Amino acid sequence: MHCGRRVALCSALVFSFAAIPPVFAQQTVEVVIQKYRFEPAEVQIRAGDTVKWINQEKRTSHSVLFAPEQGGESERFFPGESWQRKFDAPGRYVYSCGPHPEMKGVVEVVAP
């Protein structure tokens, strides 16, 4: 193969890979429930990511309550337990704790 052809072939390969959009690994973001608070209270994730709520209270159960059109309420989960949800659609998901409505949080889902 001539040197000029090799350079052209290598250049074509490099530029063809550059045109492929990056693929992001799906991630899980953790929200700790402690002292009757979601921590952090607001998280931002990409569509396809998961949020995992972990109950680190000593004695009480909690749930994660979204508006009905955004998924409704999780089962109650007790100290040491967790609940998780995958978010596929971009948007702002405001939630609270079913039994403790003063506990509030937000999941902001952006396009990948």
Regions found by a protein language model. Give the residues of each.
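Extracytoplasmic copper-binding redox domains, predominantly the cupredoxin/blue-copper superfamily
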Residues: 2-4, 10, 14-112
